[in-house]
């Protein structure tokens, strides 16, 4: 079974019933599922290529309505290693983990935190399931705070999966989550709704700084 989850995340002008903010919660419990979300168009092509070649169990890709970043699509496709995250930048104080469309917000948060003199790691997880547990554990032990970003409700989402894993291995580094609240989100422009519900780089920066004390 291969699932392409269109409108994964906030759907904006399509109306409140079209927001795809619950799918991680109802898919991540399926045994053996490979669940992916790309940060840009190139990665989306690679994930489709990887999905087509993967035959060991069910797989799914969640992707948004409209463009992701406007990246020109490359000609050469690549098979992604299942469950392997991309460490975009190393850091020692804070690790930011930006899933899919929220990677850009993580990038902006990184710039703001670095302006405060902090050493900030930036991670593109690629896989919701299986998680790259080695990368997660490395940065949870190395950094003082982790912060996850996802276009999904907080309950049973990607950040919850990260917390579940770290708790299971006895790592108690604080994890701040930037995600949608446990409610039905109204109709509106994505940027307006993100401002209204606190899904911005400014809010993320404030929350991380508060965790650092």
Each language-model region and where it sits:
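Short glycine-/polar-rich loops that comprise or flank the Walker A/P-loop
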Residues: 1, 32-33
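Thiamine diphosphate
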Residues: 4-20, 53-213
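Internal gly/pro-rich beta-alpha loop/helix module
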Residues: 13-30, 37, 41-52
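Short, structured coil segments at secondary-structure junctions
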Residues: 30-31, 171
């Amino acid at each position: 079974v291969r699932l392409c989850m269109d409108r994964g995340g906030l759907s904006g002008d399509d109306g409140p019933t079209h927001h795809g903010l619950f799918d991680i919660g109802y898919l991540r419990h399926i045994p053996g599922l490979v669940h992916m979300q790309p940060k840009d168009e190139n990665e989306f092509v690679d994930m489709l290529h990887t999905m087509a070649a993967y035959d060991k169990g069910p797989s799914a890709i969640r992707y948004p309505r409209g463009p992701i970043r406007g990246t020109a699509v490359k000609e050469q496709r690549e098979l992604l290693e299942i469950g392997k995250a991309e460490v975009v930048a190393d850091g020692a104080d804070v690790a930011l983990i930006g899933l899919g469309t929220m990677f850009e917000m993580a990038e902006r948060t990184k710039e703001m935190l670095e302006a405060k003199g902090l050493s900030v790691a930036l991670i593109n997880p690629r896989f919701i399931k299986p998680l790259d547990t080695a990368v997660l554990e490395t940065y949870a032990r190395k950094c003082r705070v982790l912060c996850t970003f996802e276009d999904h409700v907080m309950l049973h989402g990607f950040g919850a999966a990260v917390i579940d894993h770290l708790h299971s291995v006895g790592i108690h580094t604080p994890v701040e989550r930037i995600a949608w609240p446990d409610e039905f989100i109204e109709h509106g422009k994505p940027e307006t709704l993100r401002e209204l519900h606190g899904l911005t780089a400014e809010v993320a920066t404030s929350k991380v700084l508060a965790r650092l004390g």
